[in-house]
Amino acid sequence: NVSKCKFIFWKTFSDPYGVEPDVLILLDDLIIILEAKFHAGKSGVGTSEDNSILYDQLAREYLLGNYLITSRTVLDETFSYFKDFKILYLTKDISFPTSDVKDSIRTLKKYYIGNKVSSANIFWTNWQSIYHILNNLSPNELQNYEKKLVSQLLLFLEKRDLIMYNGFSFLNKYNLN
């Protein structure tokens, strides 16, 4: 059960890693760093030749998550400090973007020498799955404003063809005249 939840959009962290996650989701003692992609992939690849500068976006966000929990940074006065972080990489890929994530982990291990890097902190889903989840929410469990929000999100995802293949349907269900 989650007792506290807050969303922080596009917060810029110039130090220490120069990164701006799309959304920080604060849940009790957990931070979820959401990186959402639509037409572009992650920004940056690898490190500088001397490993002093980290270019890989997911790797920088991983280090940010680690920094936020080890430094006990206060992001909001209603939360004390965080014990763990997760990265949620949201793309329109149909399958897990293996090369993106493997490259980020490889870069982290090269850059972050002497520290443990865990792929268990990195999760992925796609927009199509978000559509499926939203579409299967029970309207009885939602407040009126949530119903409106879900409806608008579903419409947004439909207009961008971010829905899963759902089998064949009979044409007589549609008004084709």
Please tell me what each predicted stretch does.
Residues N1-N177:
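Charged, terminal alpha-helix-loop-beta segments
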